[in-house]
Amino acid sequence: QYLEPDYIIIANPDVQVSDACILRVADALEKQEDGAVASAMVVDVKGQSSFSYWDLQSVWLDLLDTGLVTRRLFRAFLKTPLEKLPLAADGVSRMVGALPGSFFMVKTGCFTPGDLKELFDKHVFLYYEEKILGQKLKQMGLKELLVTDAYYVHAHSVSIDKSYTKISDKQKLLHKSKLYYYQHYLKLGEMELAVAKAFLAVVLTEVKFLTGVLKMRW
């Protein structure tokens, strides 16, 4: 038995989404038979392009994407360029590994009510919810779509900044979610998990020094 709505929208309170954007995202999902989740390009409050998708990386690439130095050194290897992502059925949108949780649409016809209830993991908060969702959909043979000819506005970090004022506190929360994701979704063994923990400890020290001592922000 399926839910009555054809689509469900999940969004943060700090986003601005037009009716035209919503209709365009729904259209992309409708045209993609195995498309389960979709969103649009993200822009900030100044209209500048912002982060709009992730690849579902291996654990080691994911770790490199965490370090402030390694992220810059290996930038070219850490994310597939938008134009190289597979095209969706509408000929415009792209298929991605994961979408930001600030705004996305779910096509309920892809799921039973039971599947839909289990779609979101309650053991993580603020970080890695999106990649966990991406992994679950991948296991189900379903796709996430990024509509590249529509956009919405997101005032990034407004919600989280109210609860976590120190960058190092946000980083700790990120690392906790990362390790949960590695263990339960990437199925890391004890030895690999220990290496990941050691790497993240170095990253946290780096963040504390750069933000606490040098007062840097990014």
Feature annotation, model-predicted:
Residues 1-3:
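Glycine-rich, basic loop-to-helix element that forms the pyrophosphate-binding segment
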Residues 134-216:
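Active-site-adjacent helix/loop segment of glycosyltransferases
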Residues 8:
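Short aromatic/hydrophobic "clamp" motif used to bind/position activated sugar donors
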Residues 57-96:
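Short, flexible, basic/aromatic active-site loop/helix in glycosyltransferases
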Residues 5, 33-35, 142:
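Short, high-confidence coil segments that cap the C-terminus of an alpha-helix
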Residues 18-56:
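Conserved donor NDP-sugar-binding/catalytic core segment of glycosyltransferases
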Residues 12-16:
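The conserved acidic donor/metal-binding loop of glycosyltransferases
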Residues 89-151:
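A short, conserved alpha-helix in the catalytic core of glycosyltransferases
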